């Protein structure tokens, strides 16, 4: 293990993330690269803090290099999110992929991934769906018929994402070893807190809730001191995400769309565009919109991502299947020479990358549009164009 990659959101970066970086150093990682969601996040929202703040927090805690997981690929299913992250880290030259998991052993996760990628899986899934099971339950049941034990693995969020990483490595033929790490402290997506090595830990979702309800100081017990100082400064400058601005922006933009426009979106079809059109015309808040969209057929997470795709006009066709460039958001200067060995266009300026290769324009513009939208949803609204003008963070 020499060059370790992590796929993360850091929404926000907290003490559990810092502990993970320390664990990787203790296990022998000489260089750690992070592929981080930018503009938007996988749950169909905007990050609580802008990219530069999260990048600085990660570098201060021990990361060597932070590259962008561009917005269209960040707001995506677990499968697409994982595929994009693996592709970028493999292109960067990482030899190991580290991630948190409830089952921190590679073999069971790899076996489940192999079952999901097998030629027999589509028929097994179809059989379970025909029995009336919802998609997630049908998927787990189908996997269980091909790989005993897979259903249990597919019940927990970090294992699910870990299996998607394994699938991506298999399908892409990426030369990366797996390093699943035990998830320590608080469970994903809960209000529980924990303590490891004397450090209080909480999930990112709980920290976000604390900040939204009690202010930035409420995050202090759960984030490194250096990060906390960055977060205080960001809050003073109005850079925190404002849920009310997000809600208003989403509804405003959705109400300008026609059903025909919505039908061309990624993830639309099967009447979802009509359901979204009707819900947007009646909803009073974005949460009310999500409630109106709810259906047994579609997971809430998918509907949230569809809403954001509609806001950003992410098309069903035309976007490259995988990110076509490596955009460095921040780095220690000693890590920059690694870019010379990248297998896809790489650099520290989005404008520079597009200037070198115009074929990158579509993905770059989609990424820029999402960053612009995110800046609209801050307590202090920021100017447009930051994705193309931002300076790389160097330490």
Segment roles from a protein language model:
Residues 30, 64, 95:
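Receiver (REC) domain switch/active-site residues of two-component response regulators
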Residues 25, 59, 89-90:
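Non-catalytic positions within long, well-ordered alpha-helices that form the structural scaffold/packing
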Residues 7-8, 41-42, 58, 72-73, ...:
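Short, contiguous strand/loop micro-motifs
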Residues 1-54:
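N-terminal catalytic cores of NTP/NDP-binding nucleotidyl/phosphoryl-transfer enzymes
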Residues 56-70:
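A glycine-rich helix N-cap at a beta->alpha junction
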Residues 53-56, 60, 338-342:
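Acidic, Ser/Thr-rich peripheral helices and adjacent loops at domain boundaries
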Residues 68-395:
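Active-site cores that bind ATP or allylic diphosphates and position pyrophosphate for catalysis
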Residues 28, 62, 170-173:
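A broad structural signal for alpha-helix termini and local helix breaks/kinks
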């Amino acid at each position: 293990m020499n060059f370790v990659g992590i796929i993360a959101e850091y929404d926000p970066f907290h003490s559990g993330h810092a502990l993970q970086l320390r664990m990787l150093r203790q296990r022998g990682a000489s260089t750690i690269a992070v592929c981080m969601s930018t503009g938007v996040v996988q749950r169909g929202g905007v990050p609580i803090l802008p990219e530069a703040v999260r990048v600085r927090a990660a570098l201060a805690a021990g990361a060597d290099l932070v590259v962008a997981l561009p917005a269209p690929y960040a707001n995506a299913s677990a499968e697409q999110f994982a595929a994009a992250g693996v592709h970028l880290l493999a292109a960067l030259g990482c030899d190991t992929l580290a991630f948190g998991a409830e089952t921190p052993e590679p073999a069971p996760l790899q076996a489940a991934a192999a079952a999901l990628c097998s030629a027999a899986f589509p028929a097994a899934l179809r059989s379970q769906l025909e029995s009336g099971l919802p998609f997630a339950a049908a998927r787990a049941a189908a996997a269980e018929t091909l790989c005993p034990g897979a259903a249990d693995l597919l019940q927990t969020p970090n294992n699910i994402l870990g299996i998607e990483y394994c699938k991506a490595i298999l399908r892409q033929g990426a030369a990366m070893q797996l390093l699943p790490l035990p998830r320590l402290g608080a469970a994903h997506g809960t209000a529980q807190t924990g303590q490891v090595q004397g450090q209080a830990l909480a999930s990112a979702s709980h920290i976000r809730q604390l900040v939204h309800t009690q202010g930035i100081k409420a995050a202090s017990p759960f984030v490194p001191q250096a990060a906390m100082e960055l977060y205080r400064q960001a809050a003073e400058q109005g850079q925190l995400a404002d849920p009310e601005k997000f809600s208003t922006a989403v509804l405003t933009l959705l109400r300008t769309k026609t059903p025909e426009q919505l039908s061309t979106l990624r993830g639309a079809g099967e009447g979802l565009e009509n359901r979204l059109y009707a819900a947007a015309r009646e909803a009073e808040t974005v949460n009310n919109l999500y409630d109106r969209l709810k259906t047994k057929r579609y997971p809430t997470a998918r509907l949230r991502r569809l809403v954001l795709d509609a806001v950003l006009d992410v098309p069903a066709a035309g976007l490259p299947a995988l990110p076509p460039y490596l955009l460095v958001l921040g780095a220690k200067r000693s890590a920059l020479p690694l870019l010379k060995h990248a297998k896809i266009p790489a650099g520290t300026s989005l404008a520079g990358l597009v200037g070198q290769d115009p074929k990158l324009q579509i993905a770059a513009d989609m990424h820029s549009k999402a960053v612009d939208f995110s800046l609209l949803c801050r307590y202090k609204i920021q100017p447009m164009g930051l994705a193309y003008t931002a300076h790389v963070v160097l330490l």
